[in-house]
Amino acid sequence: MDETTKIAVIGGGAAGLMAAGTAASLGADVTIFEHMQYVGRKIGITGKGRCNVTNACTLQEFMENVPRNPRFLYAALSALTPDDTMQFFESLGVKLKVERARRVFPESDKAATIVNALRKYTQGAKILQEKVTSVTKEEKGFIINGNDARIYARSS
């Protein structure tokens, strides 16, 4: 093995960065695999470059606007409600504003504000600019192969 980590996160998008940051903040050894030039790249182009973070509504209101199979999303959305999302970003120092249709954006009107906050949140994690080519289950973890890296994520 080239390296060992406790937690491997495949994908440095919003969910990957939040998961990696949370694990790192709890003291875990975390490695993020991201095949793009840098983590959060797609976040930087959302909302026409402004990043619509969430909607300022209740979970019930949000679910009423899901066109198909809202029950599928219920467990995930109840674990991190729109209000939780706003509090999370505010705890990272991001000032938010609510616009028409209750869409929530960073006050700066720049998606880069969100990207930078998430990057700072993941400071304890190692980031590899690496495309994952395979994941193999082993007895006590996983082997994650990339184009130029091989990481063992141990399960104990």
Residue locations for each model-derived region?
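Alpha-helix C-terminal capping segments
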Residues: 24, 118-124, 144-146
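A conserved short coil-to-beta-strand element within the FAD-binding core of flavoproteins
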Residues: 128-141
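Small-residue (primarily alanine) positions within well-ordered alpha-helices
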Residues: 15, 19-24
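Core beta-strand elements of the Rossmann-like FAD/NAD(P) dinucleotide-binding domain
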Residues: 3-5, 146-155
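Glycine-rich FAD pyrophosphate-binding loop
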Residues: 8, 24-48
